[in-house]
């Protein structure tokens, strides 16, 4: 007994620190991934808040035409954004000490790169921390696997896409209208709506919402009756009560009759695996689609696919989308180039007479 006490007393400061970091008894689990997650996410969050409020305009296109994104420079919550790093910087690592001055760093959009790189490191560590806590508690690792879907999506738009396009200026701005601008330009340049992986992502997100609503409403409606046939079932149930009221047999019977027998799960684990896997796989595919379109492997092109016997084009929905894409493309970065790439790359049509 004495030897054990001596060993505890002689435990080093480092040993006590390790035990505290990896203890699952803490109110909030830290873990070794948390040691990196906490400072990176705090840095990204604090710089985002400061830059969103007060950052000066950024020369995003590298043509000496700064774009304002902060609240103090005339924006509101909807129009405000952290403007991406300048095209003049490209993919160069651009910390503060690489600039001649802080003013130059701000003018070239240094905060965007700082926020994005810290944020991606932070959310990756959050995913690792989920696995680490699951491991400490003897759980299975699927929580972290599910979280990998939004991590992959964020990595695709903030890192993979800029790498493929050759500049952080092509990354998604950190703001509401900036996000929509990114989506519109992405459609114009890559025809993402005609990409099968994006279609799978839409099915994953909308399907996941539908299944979540169906599951929640079904569980809430499946009561173990606490009342007689002569009074409402609601009388035996208090909204939000802690005691379980869910009966999977009743839910299975209801849903099997509403649609058909095999559309309903009678196994709770199979049901919840499906609820988790459907949106996760869909978002994985979307992230993969963004990552391939980053290198210009774009959505399907069915432009002018249908012609009559005289060779005249019969417009289809694909041609309508193509015209919309061209319109969006000529509107963005309108001072950076005279023609969008699609228009500049083709030969001029020949004229008769």
UniProtKB/Swiss-Prot annotation:
<feature type="transmembrane region" description="Helical">
    <location>
        <begin position="197"/>
        <end position="218"/>
    </location>
</feature>
<keyword id="KW-0597">Phosphoprotein</keyword>
<keyword id="KW-0148">Chlorophyll</keyword>
<keyword id="KW-0560">Oxidoreductase</keyword>
<keyword id="KW-0359">Herbicide resistance</keyword>
<feature type="binding site">
    <location>
        <position position="342"/>
    </location>
    <ligand>
        <name>[CaMn4O5] cluster</name>
    </ligand>
</feature>
<dbReference type="GO" id="GO:0045156">
    <property type="term" value="F:electron transporter, transferring electrons within the cyclic electron transport pathway of photosynthesis activity"/>
</dbReference>
<comment type="similarity">
    <text>Belongs to the reaction center PufL/M/PsbA/D family.</text>
</comment>
<feature type="propeptide">
    <location>
        <begin position="345"/>
        <end position="353"/>
    </location>
</feature>
<dbReference type="InterPro" id="IPR000484">
    <property type="entry name" value="Photo_RC_L/M"/>
</dbReference>
<feature type="site" description="Stabilizes free radical intermediate">
    <location>
        <position position="190"/>
    </location>
</feature>
<dbReference type="GO" id="GO:0016682">
    <property type="term" value="F:oxidoreductase activity, acting on diphenols and related substances as donors, oxygen as acceptor"/>
</dbReference>
<feature type="binding site">
    <location>
        <position position="333"/>
    </location>
    <ligand>
        <name>[CaMn4O5] cluster</name>
    </ligand>
</feature>
<comment type="function">
    <text>Photosystem II (PSII) is a light-driven water:plastoquinone oxidoreductase that uses light energy to abstract electrons from H(2)O, generating O(2) and a proton gradient subsequently used for ATP formation. It consists of a core antenna complex that captures photons, and an electron transfer chain that converts photonic excitation into a charge separation. The D1/D2 (PsbA/PsbD) reaction center heterodimer binds P680, the primary electron donor of PSII as well as several subsequent electron acceptors.</text>
</comment>
<dbReference type="Pfam" id="PF00124">
    <property type="entry name" value="Photo_RC"/>
</dbReference>
<dbReference type="GO" id="GO:0009635">
    <property type="term" value="P:response to herbicide"/>
</dbReference>
<keyword id="KW-0408">Iron</keyword>
<feature type="binding site">
    <location>
        <position position="215"/>
    </location>
    <ligand>
        <name>Fe cation</name>
    </ligand>
</feature>
<feature type="site" description="Cleavage; by CTPA">
    <location>
        <begin position="344"/>
        <end position="345"/>
    </location>
</feature>
<keyword id="KW-0479">Metal-binding</keyword>
<feature type="binding site">
    <location>
        <position position="272"/>
    </location>
    <ligand>
        <name>Fe cation</name>
    </ligand>
</feature>
<feature type="transmembrane region" description="Helical">
    <location>
        <begin position="142"/>
        <end position="156"/>
    </location>
</feature>
<feature type="binding site">
    <location>
        <position position="170"/>
    </location>
    <ligand>
        <name>[CaMn4O5] cluster</name>
    </ligand>
</feature>
<keyword id="KW-0604">Photosystem II</keyword>
<keyword id="KW-0813">Transport</keyword>
<dbReference type="GO" id="GO:0009772">
    <property type="term" value="P:photosynthetic electron transport in photosystem II"/>
</dbReference>
<keyword id="KW-0157">Chromophore</keyword>
<keyword id="KW-0602">Photosynthesis</keyword>
<dbReference type="InterPro" id="IPR005867">
    <property type="entry name" value="PSII_D1"/>
</dbReference>
<keyword id="KW-0249">Electron transport</keyword>
<feature type="binding site">
    <location>
        <position position="344"/>
    </location>
    <ligand>
        <name>[CaMn4O5] cluster</name>
    </ligand>
</feature>
<feature type="binding site">
    <location>
        <begin position="264"/>
        <end position="265"/>
    </location>
    <ligand>
        <name>a quinone</name>
    </ligand>
</feature>
<dbReference type="InterPro" id="IPR055265">
    <property type="entry name" value="Photo_RC_L/M_CS"/>
</dbReference>
<feature type="binding site">
    <location>
        <position position="215"/>
    </location>
    <ligand>
        <name>a quinone</name>
    </ligand>
</feature>
<feature type="binding site" description="axial binding residue">
    <location>
        <position position="198"/>
    </location>
    <ligand>
        <name>chlorophyll a PD1</name>
    </ligand>
</feature>
<keyword id="KW-0812">Transmembrane</keyword>
<feature type="modified residue" description="Phosphothreonine">
    <location>
        <position position="2"/>
    </location>
</feature>
<feature type="binding site" description="axial binding residue">
    <location>
        <position position="118"/>
    </location>
    <ligand>
        <name>chlorophyll a ChlzD1</name>
    </ligand>
</feature>
<comment type="subunit">
    <text>PSII is composed of 1 copy each of membrane proteins PsbA, PsbB, PsbC, PsbD, PsbE, PsbF, PsbH, PsbI, PsbJ, PsbK, PsbL, PsbM, PsbT, PsbX, PsbY, PsbZ, Psb30/Ycf12, at least 3 peripheral proteins of the oxygen-evolving complex and a large number of cofactors. It forms dimeric complexes.</text>
</comment>
<keyword id="KW-0934">Plastid</keyword>
<protein>
    <recommendedName>
        <fullName>Photosystem II protein D1</fullName>
        <ecNumber>1.10.3.9</ecNumber>
    </recommendedName>
</protein>
<keyword id="KW-0464">Manganese</keyword>
């Amino acid at each position: 007994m004495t030897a054990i006490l001596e060993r505890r007393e002689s435990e080093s400061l480092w040993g006590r620190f390790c035990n505290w970091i990896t203890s699952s008894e803490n109110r909030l689990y830290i873990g070794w991934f948390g040691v990196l997650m906490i400072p990176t996410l705090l840095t990204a969050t604090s710089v985002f808040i400061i830059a969103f409020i007060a950052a000066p305009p950024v020369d995003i296109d590298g043509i000496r035409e700064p774009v304002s994104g902060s609240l103090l420079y005339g924006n509101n919550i909807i129009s405000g954004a952290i403007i991406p790093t300048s095209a003049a910087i490209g993919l160069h690592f651009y910390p503060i000490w690489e600039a001649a001055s802080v003013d130059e760093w701000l003018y070239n959009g240094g905060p965007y790169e700082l926020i994005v790189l810290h944020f991606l490191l932070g959310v990756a560590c959050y995913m690792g921390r989920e696995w680490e806590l699951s491991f400490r508690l003897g759980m299975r690792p699927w929580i972290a696997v599910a979280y990998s879907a939004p991590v992959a999506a964020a990595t695709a738009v903030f890192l993979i896409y800029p790498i493929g396009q050759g500049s952080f200026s092509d990354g998604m701005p950190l703001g509401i209208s900036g996000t929509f601008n990114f989506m519109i330009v992405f459609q114009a340049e890559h025809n993402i709506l005609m990409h099968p992986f994006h279609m799978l992502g839409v099915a994953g997100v909308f399907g996941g919402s539908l299944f979540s609503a169906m599951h929640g409403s079904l569980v809430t409606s499946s009561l173990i009756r606490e009342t007689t046939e002569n009074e409402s079932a609601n009388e035996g149930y208090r909204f939000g009560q802690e005691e379980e009221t869910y009966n999977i047999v009743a839910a299975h019977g209801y849903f099997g009759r509403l649609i058909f027998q095999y559309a309903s799960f009678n196994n709770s684990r199979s049901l919840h695996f499906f609820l988790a896997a459907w949106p996760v796989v869909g978002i994985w595919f979307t992230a993969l689609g963004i990552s391939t379109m980053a290198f210009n492997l774009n959505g399907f092109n069915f432009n002018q696919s249908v012609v009559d016997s005289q060779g005249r084009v019969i417009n289809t929905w694909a041609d309508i989308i193509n015209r919309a894409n061209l319109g969006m493309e000529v509107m963005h970065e309108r001072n950076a180039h005279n023609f969008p790439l699609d228009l500049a790359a083709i030969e001029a049509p020949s004229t008769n007479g």
